[in-house]
Amino acid sequence: MKTVSFNGQRGRIAGLRFGNAEGPPVLALHGWLDNAASFIPMAPYLASHDIVAIDMLGHGASAHIPKGYDYAFVDWLHDILDVLDALGWQQAHLLGHSLGGALASVLAAGAPERVLSLALIEALGPPPWPGDHAAARLRKA
């Protein structure tokens, strides 16, 4: 495992890289108030893949959000695209936990040509039942 750094439009984005550099590309996105190290326990299970786990701006070893910006959800999407571009990855599998999963889902919807697949852990997603069952399920809950 090695530390990596990318120059995004809003600042320096730090991260960790591990696995097989010749393997399928996977960009790992952590949850709110977390960092790239949260993916270290998964490293042995992903050894055949080229994993880059980033610290989103304002988290871990990455830069703070610069003046004039805030922690807007959409801005992190641009940061993720900056990292994919810096890596030279036209496409990648996205692995997201919590906030990272929500970001991965929105990126897949907005830029599907960049996303090979999604693996989401405790993330937002569509309910696994028909929409007309939603009211009854909420009442039951």
Go through each PLM region and give its residues.
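A generic "structured core" feature
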Residues: 26-29, 52, 94-95, 104-109
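Conserved HGGG/HGGXW glycine-rich cap/lid loop of the alpha/beta-hydrolase fold
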Residues: 14-64
